């Protein structure tokens, strides 16, 4: 069920005009309870520059995905690329953002460590897409004025344009 739902969500994501136009995309290597991105990363790595986050202390460092052979198990049991560090944040066109919950205003609830809260302000011009299963779309997520909202939420077969 998770694999099928993930495939449907990611099919909607890749059909979005902002994704189609993007050259450099920040994805994430999913955990067992998240939308499964493993096959999606491999699929798009031959057509677009794919970046994946690596946990370094209290921050996320971005690295270029070069293939499954260059992955290692990092913090929290997450597979992370060992390739080149990427620091040209202005070149990132699109970001797929994981979360525990999202609301229709684009607010996101993460896992509580603040990694994306610290990363996203460095990438203001990229389209930010929260991707989630239907049960993760909730009425309201608590948000502070400094929280970065998602531009779109991709759930099931469709996108919800985040708005106030």
Regions found by a protein language model. Give the residues of each.
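Conserved small/polar residues in nucleotide/adenosyl-binding loops
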Residues: 158-163
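N-terminal active-site beta-alpha-beta segment that forms phosphate/nucleotide-binding
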Residues: 1-90
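Structured adenosyl-cofactor binding patch, chiefly the S-adenosyl-L-methionine
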Residues: 116, 121-155
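Active-site beta-strand/loop microenvironment that shapes enzyme catalytic pockets
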Residues: 91-128
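Short, structured patches in soluble enzyme cores that scaffold and shape functional sites
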Residues: 54, 64, 80, 132-135, ...
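Conserved acidic residues
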Residues: 23, 93, 151
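Redox-cofactor binding/interface segments in oxidoreductases and associated redox assembly factors
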Residues: 27, 97-98, 155
């Amino acid at each position: 069920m998770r694999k099928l739902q993930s495939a449907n969500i990611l099919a909607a994501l890749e059909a979005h005009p902002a994704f189609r136009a993007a050259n450099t995309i920040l994805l994430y290597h999913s955990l067992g309870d998240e939308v499964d991105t493993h096959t999606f990363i491999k699929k798009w790595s031959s057509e677009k520059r794919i970046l994946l986050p690596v946990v370094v202390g209290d921050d996320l460092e971005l690295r270029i995905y070069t293939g499954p052979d260059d992955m290692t198990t990092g913090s929290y049991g997450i597979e992370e690329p060992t390739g080149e560090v990427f620091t040209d944040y202005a070149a990132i066109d699109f970001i797929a953002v994981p979360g525990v919950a999202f609301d229709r205003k684009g607010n996101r609830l993460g896992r509580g460590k603040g990694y994306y809260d610290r990363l996203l302000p460095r990438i203001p011009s990229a389209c930010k897409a929260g991707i989630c299963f239907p049960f993760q779309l909730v009425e309201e997520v608590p948000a502070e004025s400094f929280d970065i909202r998602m531009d779109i939420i991709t759930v099931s077969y469709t996108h919800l344009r985040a708005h106030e």
